[in-house]
Amino acid sequence: MISLSPPTICNSAVENSTFFNCDFSGADLSGTEFIGCQFYDRESQKGCNFSRANLKDAIFKSCDLSMADFRNINALGIEIRHCRAQGSDFRGASFMNMITTRTWFCSAYITNTNLSYANFSKVVLEKCELWENRWMGTQVLGATFSGSDLSGGEFSSFDWRAANVTHCDLTNSELGDLDIRGVDLQGVKLDSYQASLLLERLGIAVMG
């Protein structure tokens, strides 16, 4: 595995570059913009290691981040747009700015990205921009998405009971096997088609 030494390339712009089996663990990548970069080696089926890296305000656009290790990163303000991130591990990632021990806010923009089989277990992504992503088989046990925009998403093989999705925008999403009897949907936004479909699963016919 190739390691960065010294582990700092913050506030840089990197385009159309390839990083196979690279170790960015602990690196300061804050404010760095990656466009059209490859971080996944298809031959070895391995992604890059970003664990414990500072990715505050970092931007990934049109990148392949499949199987990347994002555990325990500082990800406040991160942008991941139009990327492939299948199988990536975000456990322990912090998207929070702690103001006091009881007051915080989250900031993240993960949009138009394939998050199939990624691991977001126990991650807090409240009031974030998370729209038009693919969530097939994504691990979300104990995750909190409360108040986030999850609209336009694809949620096949998604365990709705495992995560907090209260007050989320789910309009225009494919909701997979969502059963409203076992999920707290307080404050959730649904469009009329979704609402009628969910009620039909309970044997309730919606007229008009």
Name each region found by the language model.
Residues 1-208:
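Tandem repeat scaffolds
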